[in-house]
Protein backbone atom coordinates (compact mmCIF):
# COMPACT_ATOMS: atom_id res chain seq x y z
CA UNK A 1 0.00 0.00 0.00
CA UNK A 2 1.33 3.42 -0.96
CA UNK A 3 1.52 5.82 1.99
CA UNK A 4 1.04 9.49 1.20
CA UNK A 5 2.22 12.63 2.95
CA UNK A 6 -0.37 14.17 5.24
CA UNK A 7 -0.95 17.87 4.44
CA UNK A 8 -0.39 18.72 8.13
CA UNK A 9 2.70 16.56 8.57
CA UNK A 10 4.82 19.57 9.61
CA UNK A 11 2.42 20.23 12.51
CA UNK A 12 1.77 16.88 14.21
CA UNK A 13 -0.41 18.51 16.87
CA UNK A 14 -2.78 19.84 14.23
CA UNK A 15 -2.52 16.61 12.25
CA UNK A 16 -3.53 14.55 15.28
CA UNK A 17 -6.41 16.89 16.01
CA UNK A 18 -7.77 15.91 12.61
CA UNK A 19 -6.74 12.25 12.64
CA UNK A 20 -8.03 11.59 16.15
CA UNK A 21 -11.61 12.00 14.95
CA UNK A 22 -11.25 8.56 13.38
CA UNK A 23 -8.67 6.98 15.68
CA UNK A 24 -9.02 4.74 18.71
CA UNK A 25 -6.55 5.20 21.58
CA UNK A 26 -6.96 2.92 24.57
CA UNK A 27 -4.57 3.29 27.50
CA UNK A 28 -3.37 -0.02 28.94
CA UNK A 29 -2.15 -0.54 32.50
CA UNK A 30 -0.06 -3.70 32.38
CA UNK A 31 1.41 -5.33 35.46
CA UNK A 32 4.71 -7.15 35.45
CA UNK A 33 4.16 -10.90 35.02
CA UNK A 34 4.73 -13.10 38.05
CA UNK A 35 5.17 -16.40 36.21
CA UNK A 36 7.42 -17.56 33.40
CA UNK A 37 6.24 -17.28 29.81
CA UNK A 38 4.85 -20.54 28.38
CA UNK A 39 6.88 -22.40 25.77
CA UNK A 40 4.79 -21.07 22.89
CA UNK A 41 5.33 -17.42 23.82
CA UNK A 42 8.34 -15.12 23.71
CA UNK A 43 8.75 -12.82 26.72
CA UNK A 44 9.99 -9.38 25.68
CA UNK A 45 11.36 -6.80 28.15
CA UNK A 46 11.49 -3.21 26.90
CA UNK A 47 13.45 -0.16 28.03
CA UNK A 48 14.51 3.08 26.37
CA UNK A 49 16.13 6.43 27.13
CA UNK A 50 18.38 5.34 29.98
CA UNK A 51 20.92 8.10 29.15
CA UNK A 52 23.91 6.48 30.90
CA UNK A 53 21.95 6.39 34.15
CA UNK A 54 21.67 2.61 34.55
CA UNK A 55 23.86 2.69 37.72
CA UNK A 56 21.07 4.69 39.38
CA UNK A 57 18.19 2.40 38.43
CA UNK A 58 16.41 1.26 41.59
CA UNK A 59 14.40 -1.59 40.06
CA UNK A 60 15.37 -5.05 38.87
CA UNK A 61 15.18 -5.66 35.14
CA UNK A 62 12.69 -8.53 34.72
CA UNK A 63 13.89 -11.77 33.18
CA UNK A 64 12.73 -12.68 29.70
CA UNK A 65 13.71 -14.17 26.38
CA UNK A 66 14.34 -10.87 24.59
CA UNK A 67 15.52 -7.51 25.88
CA UNK A 68 14.85 -4.45 23.70
CA UNK A 69 16.37 -1.01 24.20
CA UNK A 70 14.76 1.61 21.94
CA UNK A 71 17.61 4.14 21.88
CA UNK A 72 19.17 7.00 23.85
CA UNK A 73 21.25 4.68 25.99
CA UNK A 74 23.85 7.48 26.29
CA UNK A 75 23.90 11.24 26.77
CA UNK A 76 26.03 11.98 23.71
CA UNK A 77 27.41 8.69 22.41
CA UNK A 78 30.89 8.99 23.91
CA UNK A 79 33.09 5.91 23.79
CA UNK A 80 33.14 5.56 27.57
CA UNK A 81 29.34 5.71 27.69
CA UNK A 82 29.02 3.02 25.03
CA UNK A 83 31.51 0.76 26.81
CA UNK A 84 29.67 1.18 30.12
CA UNK A 85 26.31 0.44 28.47
CA UNK A 86 27.77 -2.63 26.78
CA UNK A 87 29.02 -3.90 30.13
CA UNK A 88 25.63 -3.25 31.74
CA UNK A 89 23.61 -4.99 29.06
CA UNK A 90 26.11 -7.86 29.05
CA UNK A 91 25.14 -8.63 32.64
CA UNK A 92 21.44 -8.96 31.83
CA UNK A 93 20.20 -12.58 31.69
CA UNK A 94 18.22 -12.34 28.45
CA UNK A 95 19.40 -14.62 25.64
CA UNK A 96 18.61 -12.07 22.94
CA UNK A 97 19.44 -8.39 23.51
CA UNK A 98 18.44 -5.92 20.82
CA UNK A 99 19.43 -2.25 20.73
CA UNK A 100 18.82 0.69 18.41
CA UNK A 101 20.31 4.17 18.57
CA UNK A 102 18.46 7.37 19.38
CA UNK A 103 19.08 11.05 18.82
CA UNK A 104 21.65 11.14 21.65
CA UNK A 105 23.93 8.56 20.03
CA UNK A 106 25.79 11.20 18.00
CA UNK A 107 28.72 8.91 17.26
CA UNK A 108 26.43 6.32 15.64
CA UNK A 109 25.16 8.70 12.93
CA UNK A 110 27.49 8.82 9.94
CA UNK A 111 26.22 12.27 8.96
CA UNK A 112 27.95 13.52 12.10
CA UNK A 113 31.09 11.37 12.00
CA UNK A 114 31.81 11.39 8.25
CA UNK A 115 33.00 14.08 7.96
CA UNK A 116 33.11 15.87 11.29
CA UNK A 117 33.65 19.30 9.72
CA UNK A 118 30.45 19.45 7.64
CA UNK A 119 26.91 18.61 8.62
CA UNK A 120 23.76 19.45 6.75
CA UNK A 121 20.66 19.96 8.83
CA UNK A 122 17.09 19.63 7.65
CA UNK A 123 16.90 23.30 6.75
CA UNK A 124 19.88 22.79 4.41
CA UNK A 125 22.22 25.04 6.38
CA UNK A 126 25.80 23.83 6.67
CA UNK A 127 27.51 24.03 10.02
CA UNK A 128 31.04 23.44 11.19
CA UNK A 129 31.58 20.86 13.89
CA UNK A 130 31.89 23.65 16.45
CA UNK A 131 28.50 25.13 15.63
CA UNK A 132 26.93 21.68 15.76
CA UNK A 133 28.13 21.43 19.35
CA UNK A 134 26.77 24.89 20.09
CA UNK A 135 23.32 23.73 18.97
CA UNK A 136 23.24 20.59 21.11
CA UNK A 137 22.23 20.56 24.81
CA UNK A 138 25.01 18.82 26.71
CA UNK A 139 23.04 17.07 29.49
CA UNK A 140 26.02 17.74 31.72
CA UNK A 141 28.59 16.47 29.22
CA UNK A 142 31.51 18.72 28.31
CA UNK A 143 31.91 20.15 24.83
CA UNK A 144 35.12 18.13 24.58
CA UNK A 145 33.19 14.93 25.28
CA UNK A 146 30.65 15.84 22.61
CA UNK A 147 33.37 16.58 20.08
CA UNK A 148 35.17 13.35 20.89
CA UNK A 149 31.93 11.38 20.51
CA UNK A 150 31.19 12.86 17.12
CA UNK A 151 34.72 12.10 15.91
CA UNK A 152 34.66 8.45 17.05
CA UNK A 153 34.49 6.00 14.15
CA UNK A 154 33.26 2.38 14.19
CA UNK A 155 31.81 2.85 17.65
CA UNK A 156 29.09 0.28 16.95
CA UNK A 157 31.79 -2.38 17.14
CA UNK A 158 31.96 -1.79 20.89
CA UNK A 159 28.42 -3.15 21.33
CA UNK A 160 29.60 -6.73 21.66
CA UNK A 161 26.95 -7.91 24.13
CA UNK A 162 23.86 -7.19 22.03
CA UNK A 163 22.51 -7.07 18.49
CA UNK A 164 22.53 -3.53 17.14
CA UNK A 165 19.82 -2.82 14.57
CA UNK A 166 19.90 0.13 12.20
CA UNK A 167 17.35 -0.17 9.39
CA UNK A 168 17.69 -3.92 9.80
CA UNK A 169 15.96 -6.90 11.37
CA UNK A 170 16.56 -10.01 13.40
CA UNK A 171 14.38 -13.12 13.61
CA UNK A 172 14.03 -14.75 17.02
CA UNK A 173 12.12 -18.04 17.08
CA UNK A 174 10.16 -16.94 14.03
CA UNK A 175 9.34 -13.49 15.46
CA UNK A 176 10.60 -10.74 13.14
CA UNK A 177 11.96 -7.67 14.92
CA UNK A 178 12.93 -4.58 12.92
CA UNK A 179 14.82 -1.61 14.35
CA UNK A 180 15.35 1.91 13.01
CA UNK A 181 16.75 4.99 14.81
CA UNK A 182 15.37 7.86 12.72
CA UNK A 183 13.09 10.57 14.04
CA UNK A 184 11.68 13.92 12.86
CA UNK A 185 14.15 16.77 13.24
CA UNK A 186 14.77 17.63 16.88
CA UNK A 187 17.45 20.14 17.94
CA UNK A 188 19.85 18.95 15.20
CA UNK A 189 20.63 15.72 17.06
CA UNK A 190 21.58 12.37 15.55
CA UNK A 191 19.39 10.49 13.08
CA UNK A 192 17.25 13.58 12.47
CA UNK A 193 15.41 13.95 9.18
CA UNK A 194 12.79 16.50 8.09
CA UNK A 195 9.14 15.56 8.49
CA UNK A 196 7.28 14.33 5.45
CA UNK A 197 9.08 12.66 2.55
CA UNK A 198 12.41 12.25 4.35
CA UNK A 199 10.83 10.44 7.29
CA UNK A 200 8.58 8.38 5.05
CA UNK A 201 11.57 7.20 3.01
CA UNK A 202 12.94 5.62 6.19
CA UNK A 203 9.63 3.97 7.07
CA UNK A 204 9.29 2.56 3.55
CA UNK A 205 12.29 0.35 4.32
CA UNK A 206 10.39 -1.52 7.05
CA UNK A 207 9.21 -4.98 5.89
CA UNK A 208 5.49 -5.65 5.90
CA UNK A 209 5.92 -8.92 7.81
CA UNK A 210 7.44 -7.24 10.89
CA UNK A 211 6.03 -8.57 14.17
CA UNK A 212 7.76 -6.14 16.55
CA UNK A 213 8.75 -2.72 15.26
CA UNK A 214 11.34 -0.80 17.27
CA UNK A 215 11.78 2.90 16.50
CA UNK A 216 13.19 5.69 18.61
CA UNK A 217 10.44 8.14 17.71
CA UNK A 218 6.81 7.52 18.57
CA UNK A 219 4.10 7.74 15.95
CA UNK A 220 1.77 10.68 16.30
CA UNK A 221 -1.02 10.04 18.80
CA UNK A 222 0.63 7.33 20.90
CA UNK A 223 3.13 8.14 23.64
CA UNK A 224 4.14 11.39 21.93
CA UNK A 225 2.38 14.09 23.98
CA UNK A 226 4.92 16.53 25.42
CA UNK A 227 4.47 18.40 28.70
CA UNK A 228 3.89 21.55 26.63
CA UNK A 229 0.80 20.00 25.05
CA UNK A 230 2.54 19.58 21.70
CA UNK A 231 2.57 16.30 19.79
CA UNK A 232 6.06 15.19 18.73
CA UNK A 233 5.29 11.93 16.92
CA UNK A 234 5.59 11.25 13.21
CA UNK A 235 2.39 11.37 11.17
CA UNK A 236 3.72 9.18 8.36
CA UNK A 237 5.01 6.63 10.86
CA UNK A 238 1.50 6.18 12.25
CA UNK A 239 0.09 5.84 8.76
CA UNK A 240 2.78 3.34 7.79
CA UNK A 241 2.32 1.28 10.94
CA UNK A 242 -1.46 1.15 10.74
CA UNK A 243 -1.94 0.73 7.00
CA UNK A 244 1.09 -1.14 5.66
CA UNK A 245 3.22 -2.86 8.30
CA UNK A 246 0.56 -3.71 10.89
CA UNK A 247 2.97 -5.13 13.49
CA UNK A 248 1.69 -6.73 16.65
CA UNK A 249 3.80 -4.40 18.78
CA UNK A 250 5.46 -1.02 18.20
CA UNK A 251 8.15 -0.18 20.77
CA UNK A 252 9.75 3.28 21.03
CA UNK A 253 10.86 5.99 23.47
CA UNK A 254 12.20 9.52 22.84
CA UNK A 255 9.36 11.42 24.58
CA UNK A 256 9.98 10.70 28.25
CA UNK A 257 6.62 11.98 29.47
CA UNK A 258 4.87 9.69 26.97
CA UNK A 259 5.86 6.55 28.90
CA UNK A 260 3.23 3.83 28.89
CA UNK A 261 1.15 1.50 26.75
CA UNK A 262 -1.73 2.20 24.40
CA UNK A 263 -3.60 0.43 21.63
CA UNK A 264 -5.62 1.37 18.57
CA UNK A 265 -7.56 -1.88 18.89
CA UNK A 266 -5.20 -3.84 16.67
CA UNK A 267 -1.62 -2.73 17.42
CA UNK A 268 -0.07 -2.26 20.85
CA UNK A 269 2.15 0.82 21.21
CA UNK A 270 4.81 0.92 23.93
CA UNK A 271 6.72 4.02 25.00
CA UNK A 272 9.39 2.38 27.13
CA UNK A 273 11.26 5.53 28.22
CA UNK A 274 13.06 4.72 31.45
CA UNK A 275 13.94 8.31 32.29
CA UNK A 276 11.14 10.65 33.22
CA UNK A 277 10.85 14.30 32.23
CA UNK A 278 13.49 15.23 34.82
CA UNK A 279 15.96 12.66 33.47
CA UNK A 280 15.52 10.41 36.47
CA UNK A 281 15.45 6.66 35.61
CA UNK A 282 12.21 6.00 37.45
CA UNK A 283 10.01 4.25 34.87
CA UNK A 284 10.14 0.44 35.14
CA UNK A 285 10.59 -1.80 32.11
CA UNK A 286 7.52 -2.81 30.13
CA UNK A 287 7.04 -6.53 29.54
CA UNK A 288 4.87 -8.42 27.09
CA UNK A 289 4.52 -11.97 25.75
CA UNK A 290 4.15 -12.55 22.02
CA UNK A 291 2.84 -15.84 20.64
CA UNK A 292 5.29 -17.77 18.50
CA UNK A 293 4.36 -18.92 14.98
CA UNK A 294 2.52 -22.27 14.79
CA UNK A 295 4.82 -25.20 15.42
CA UNK A 296 7.63 -23.06 16.86
CA UNK A 297 8.77 -23.46 20.44
CA UNK A 298 11.64 -21.82 22.29
CA UNK A 299 13.18 -25.16 23.15
What are these regions (language model features)?
Residues 127-147, 173-212, 229-238:
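Binuclear metal-dependent hydrolase catalytic cores centered on His/Asp/Glu-rich metal-binding motifs
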Residues 60-62, 89-94, 206-207, 231, ...:
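Short, conserved loop/helix-junction motifs that constitute active-site signature segments
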